[in-house]
Structure formats: C-alpha cells, structure tokens
C-alpha cells in the first residue's frame, strides 16, 4: 500500500501549506541558479513533519530539476557522498536537466557507517555547481558547527494546528472516506504541528476501519512520542548497523519500552517469514541481556541489549521493505490500561490473604487458587474463609460469580443471628455482683488478740534457734536436710 504522505506530497510550492516567507526565499535562491549565479547551499532546520523535504521536492518540480536524495536510512560515509553527491553536484542528469541534491537529516550522520560524511559534505558544497538543500531536525549539534558556516540557514517552524485539518479533509475526500469533522480536528490536535504524522494517523485510522472520535482520541501525542515513531521508521527501513543503533539515541523511552515497540511492529513490517523469525531471534537475545542487567545490576550489558534490539532486528531482513507501514504503540500498554481496575482488585485480595498467612502476595496467589476451588464446591467452609480473610461481596463476585457469592453469604447470614442471641446471655452471667467478705463485729473479735500474736512470734523464734544449733553441731553428721 502506498503511503499517503508520498502520494499526496505537494507537487508545487503553491500547494504547500504555510511557510510563505521560506517559499519566497527558496524561489529567489533557485532563480539565481537558473540565471547562472551560484549560491550557497541551503540548510532547512526544523522539527519532524514541518515540511522541509516537501519544500525541497516542490521547488524542484516547479523549476524542472531532477532530485537526488540521500536520507537517514541510507549509508552516507565519505565514499558514498563522494561518488553519489560529488558527481551529481557538478553534472547534469541523464535527462539533460540540472539536478537538485537533497541531503535529508544531516544531523543524523554518526557512527562508523557515516564516518567522514560531514567533512565530505563540506568539501562537496564548496565545489558544487548544482543547488544543494540540506535538512536537519537539530542543526545545533556540535558535529554540524563547521557545516553551518558553509550554508544559508533557514528555520522552518512547525505547521500550525489550524493548517492541518484542510489538508486531511482534502486527502480523505480523494480517498473516498467520509470523516466527521471532530475526528479530523482530534487528529490535528494530536499531531503537535507534525503534518506528516497527522497524514499517517489519518491513513492508519482509515485503513483500519476505525474513524470514530473515540478511536482518534487514542492516538499517541506526537509532542512526546514522535521520536519513537521516527525511531521505528529508521529501524524497520534501514539495513545499516550504525544508523539503526543511533535511531533510539534521542528517544525519551526506557529500553524495555522500545523493545515492546519493536516487538509489536515487527510483524507489520517484515512480511517474509524468514525475516520475521530472524528479527524475533535477535529481539529475544536482547531480552536475555536486558534481564541480566536488572538481575545482576551490571549495566555494562546495556549496550549489548540495545544493539541487539535495534541493529539486530534491522539487519535481520534480507532487503528493505518499501511502502507504508502502520506503526502502532504496544498493545500490552492498552491492555494494562484497560485492566488496571481488575488488577487492583486482585492486588487488594492478595494483600488480605498475605496479611493473614504471613506470606508474600506472590505466595498468596497459590493459596488463592485453592480457595477458589473451595468456593465453588463447599459453601460452609467457604463462609469461614470469607470471614477469616475479611473478603467483601464485591471481591467474591470478582473471584467467582454472583450465584456462588450469594450462596456463601447466605450461609454467613444464617450464622449471625445465633451469635447475636448468645452474646446478651453471656453478658448477664458475667455481670454477677462480686462477693464482699462480711466484716466481723467488734464484739466477735478475740478478747486478747495482742497476747496471742506475741506468743506465736516467740514460738517461731525458738524453733528457728533450735534448727540453727543443729546445723552448727560438729559432732552431728550432716545430712542433706541440713542444706535446706
């Protein structure tokens, strides 16, 4: 299937939305070449989807120039640039027409595959007879400092959100789709000024048969996720190691998340079984290294995991796949979002079981499996378990169903009245007045209590003295009793 971005790319500057000042500058620049006046190459700098490449192709079409392009998915080292760009910069095309050279995303030049690329570009620019247009997302990278001194820099801003709906409406009409205006506006608002992303989103929704407002609302916010989409495009389309490994360098996502993205989109891109099998083989090896990083806390393995998931999957295919591919966020994220409430309920139940059994929630899961079997077969025992673990009616319906839950709670309800009747009886028996000893009257006391007490004390002292003498008597043989 042909990409709508390419199919409906403006053929003329008049068809390009916005960028009026930039278009005027480009027209003056190209007309200087037409009149035989050599000009400095132009570097168009701006965010992805702002129309940099489209502007270059549109002006080439308007002035009948053939285009030779090298982009981020191509190898762009010193030799390639010298052979392809160097030759084209000083000669006419095979049709006899002059050539416009487009070097796309020059800020992506890096690694061994692009070694010497920037230096060779500068060399070619100084001797170029034909017009050269370069594009870059981040023109202020240190590697491009010398390059900036050899070009005329033009900043291309993002497409205004209000300029996107007319373009989408026009494309939808030509493709025969009737789309609600709310859907078009939702797509435009999610694009974040990236017209290319908006067109891709429109094609994704249209070809997927989901043109409702709710479907459009689920589109990723390109302001935060456009980098990951660009990375997917480069990894899936390129066959060069360094280009693939550098694709995720500026992506603000964790390596595990990038792995999920690649896993989700591999079957969408790799149509040959052999390529798909090789791609997943490299991805599985990446997952092994990623697991070792987290288990052993040895982050030196991080680079191997990254290389295997990017360059490994990129080089797994025998050749590049052409045409449009609908890349999508990992479905696991959508499933996790939808099941968030369910997982929270399960988490709460496992916490209750873990608290009572003095185990972890992981082990509590094993206990829960047996409990569910009991719930389905024995209401009486189930009632005791429910009371012990303090499970609610809602939690029981989540674990079983309404019928089983109703039976168990009816057993619990049948027990409660008996317990309530016994409690008052127990309270009555417990509330008995304490026995208070009767206080004797003064007339009943002994007449001479003091004399009796003194006699008792004297007898005790005499007995104690006698025992002490027996212990000290050396003639008397000591027995065990003497030690007590």
Curated annotation (Swiss-Prot):
Keyword ATP-binding: yes
Residues that hold ATP according to the record: 46-53
Known partners and oligomeric status: Heteromultimer composed of small subunits (RfcS) and large subunits (RfcL).
SMART domains (UniProt xref): AAA (SM00382)
HAMAP family: RfcL
CDD domains given in the database record: AAA, HLD_clamp_RFC
Its job: Part of the RFC clamp loader complex which loads the PCNA sliding clamp onto DNA.
InterPro entries, per the entry: AAA+_ATPase (IPR003593), ATPase_AAA_core (IPR003959), P-loop_NTPase (IPR027417), Rep_factor-C_lsu (IPR023935), RFC_lid (IPR047854)
Name recorded for this polypeptide: Replication factor C large subunit
Pfam families from the UniProt entry: AAA, RCF1-5-like_lid
Biased composition (Basic and acidic residues): 463-478
Family membership: Belongs to the activator 1 small subunits family. RfcL subfamily.
Gene3D superfamilies per UniProt: 1.10.8.60, P-loop containing nucleotide triphosphate hydrolases
Region (Disordered): 463-484
GO molecular function, one term: DNA clamp loader activity
Swiss-Prot/TrEMBL keywords: ATP-binding, DNA replication, Nucleotide-binding
Zinc among keywords: no
One GO process term, biological-process aspect: DNA replication
């Amino acid at each position: 299937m042909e990409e709508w971005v390419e199919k409906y790319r403006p053929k003329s500057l008049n068809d390009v939305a916005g960028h009026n000042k930039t278009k005027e500058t480009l027209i003056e620049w190209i007309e200087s070449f037409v009149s035989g006046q050599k000009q400095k190459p132009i570097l168009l700098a701006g965010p992805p989807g702002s129309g940099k490449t489209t502007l270059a192709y549109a002006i080439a079409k308007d002035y009948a120039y053939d285009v030779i392009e090298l982009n981020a998915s191509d190898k762009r080292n010193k030799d390639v640039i010298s052979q392809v760009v160097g030759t084209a910069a000083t000669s006419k095309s095979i049709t006899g027409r002059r050539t416009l050279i487009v070097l796309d995303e020059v800020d992506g030049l890096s690694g061994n595959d692009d070694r010497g690329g920037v230096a060779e570009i500068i060399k070619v620019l100084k001797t170029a007879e034909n017009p050269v247009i370069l594009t870059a997302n981040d023109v202020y990278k240190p590697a491009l400092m010398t390059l900036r001194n050899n070009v005329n820099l033009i900043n291309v801003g993002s497409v205004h959100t209000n300029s996107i709906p007319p373009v989408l409406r026009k494309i939808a009409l030509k493709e025969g789709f009737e789309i609600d205006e709310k859907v078009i506006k939702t797509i435009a608002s999610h694009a974040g000024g990236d017209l290319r992303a908006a067109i891709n989103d429109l094609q994704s929704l249209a070809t997927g048969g989901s043109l409702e407002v709710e479907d459009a609302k689920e589109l990723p916010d390109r302001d935060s996720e456009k980098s990951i989409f660009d990375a997917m495009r480069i990894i899936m389309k390129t066959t060069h190691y360094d280009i693939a490994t550098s694709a995720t360098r500026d992506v603000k996502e964790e390596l595990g998340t990038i792995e999920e993205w690649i896993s989700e989109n591999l079957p969408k891109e790799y149509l040959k079984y052999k390529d798909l099998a090789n791609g997943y083989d490299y991805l599985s090896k990446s997952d092994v290294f990623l697991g070792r990083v987290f288990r052993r806390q040895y982050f030196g393995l991080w680079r191997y995991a990254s290389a295997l998931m990017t360059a490994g999957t990129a080089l797994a295919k025998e050749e590049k796949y052409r045409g449009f591919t609908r890349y999508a966020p990992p479905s696991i994220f959508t499933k996790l979002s939808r099941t968030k409430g369910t997982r929270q309920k399960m988490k709460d139940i496992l916490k209750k079981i873990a608290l009572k059994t003095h185990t972890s929630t992981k082990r509590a899961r094993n206990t829960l499996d047996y409990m569910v079997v009991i719930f389905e077969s024995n209401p009486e025992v189930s009632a005791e378990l429910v009371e012990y673990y303090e499970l609610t009616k809602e939690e029981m319906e989540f674990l079983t169903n309404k019928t089983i839950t109703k039976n168990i709670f009816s057993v619990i309800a049948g027990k409660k009245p008996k317990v309530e009747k016994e409690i008052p009886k127990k309270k009555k028996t417990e509330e008995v007045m304490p026995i208070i000893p009767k206080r004797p009257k003064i007339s009943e006391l002994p007449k001479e209590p003091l004399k009796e007490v003194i006699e008792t004390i004297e007898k005790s002292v005499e007995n104690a003295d006698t025992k002490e003498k027996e212990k000290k008597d050396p003639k008397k043989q000591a027995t065990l009793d003497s030690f007590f």
